[in-house]
């Protein structure tokens, strides 16, 4: 039975959800949470004693992005063991669920039960806003991982999707040269019309040796052994594509190349900014309903 004591109920989450809670409380909403712990969490947020209490206490449920990393547990900043299937079984037709990167099995269940839901990471405007934190975090990671400046360097971005585009435009003001190599002819054309240098994907191996920084956004193996062999010894390779990424990491380590799969950046970098645009979209959707 839904009691609906609070405007919002947060289940699990990271720093983005902590800042979302604080902002919502600051503008007068009531909030309860379960599995969300941090010293800066506003003490007006009421901690639920159980998952069941959290779910039945609010019609609007906010979950993490991604909701789960292993498909079994809801991601949490606490040590609580929050089972995804237990959470789903507590939902009713009166609930509306927000979160990100919902599993196909979860969306199928919600649709079958007629429960309203919204996956933030299926919303174009949020994906674009998210690309800001992703690109800035990627640049920060590159800077602290390298022995040289971005200034006067040569950078290559593999792919030219949303995150790659934002990253490319930010790098342009920092690097001597930013080139794009994309498998898609449309993406290559988009890079060219944005005045970036373009490298044909089938010419990657013969051109790779000039780059100081390589950023991969393609979620399949593109940085093969053959290509890695031709990279500079001091190259920094940052892979922000979905796991397992697009780099042969074991071989990169074997030959002494720095390569790192760097994921979940908006949860690590500028979470307060991410929380602001998530709340903006959330409240807009609530008002519509």
What do the predicted segments below correspond to?
Residues 8-18, 24, 151-171:
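Glycine-rich adenosine-cofactor-binding loop
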Residues 14, 37, 103, 183-184, ...:
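Residues in the short beta-alpha loop(s) of Rossmann-like NAD(P)-binding domains
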Residues 4-46, 52-53:
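N-terminal glycine-/charge-rich "phosphate-binding" loop or analogous flexible N-terminal tail
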């Amino acid at each position: 039975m839904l009691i609906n004591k609070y405007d919002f109920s947060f289940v699990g989450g990271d720093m983005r959800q902590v800042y979302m809670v604080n902002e919502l409380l600051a503008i007068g909403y009531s909030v309860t949470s379960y599995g969300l712990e941090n010293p800066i969490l506003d003490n007006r947020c009421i901690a639920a004693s159980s998952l069941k209490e959290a779910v039945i206490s609010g019609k609007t449920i906010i979950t993490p992005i991604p909701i789960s990393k292993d498909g079994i547990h809801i991601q949490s900043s606490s040590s609580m063991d929050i089972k995804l299937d237990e959470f789903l079984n507590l939902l009713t037709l009166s609930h509306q669920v927000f979160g990100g990167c919902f599993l196909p099995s979860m969306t199928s269940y919600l649709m079958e039960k007629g429960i309203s839901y919204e996956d933030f990471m299926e919303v174009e405007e949020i994906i674009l806003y998210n690309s800001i934190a992703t690109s800035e975090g990627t640049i920060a990671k590159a800077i602290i991982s390298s022995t040289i400046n971005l200034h006067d360097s040569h950078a290559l971005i593999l792919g030219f999707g949303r995150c790659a585009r934002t990253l490319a435009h930010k790098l342009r003001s920092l690097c001597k040269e930013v080139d794009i190599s994309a498998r898609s002819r449309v993406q290559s054309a988009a890079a060219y019309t944005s005045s970036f240098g373009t490298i044909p994907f089938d010419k990657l191996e013969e051109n790779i040796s000039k780059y100081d920084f390589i950023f991969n956004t393609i979620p399949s193996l593109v940085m093969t052994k053959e290509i890695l062999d031709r990279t500079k010894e001091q190259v920094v390779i940052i892979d922000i594509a979905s796991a397992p990424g697009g780099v042969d990491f074991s071989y990169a380590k074997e030959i002494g190349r720095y390569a790192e799969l760097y994921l979940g950046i908006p949860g690590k970098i500028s979470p307060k900014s991410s929380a602001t645009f998530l709340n903006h979209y959330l409240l807009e959707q609530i008002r519509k309903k």
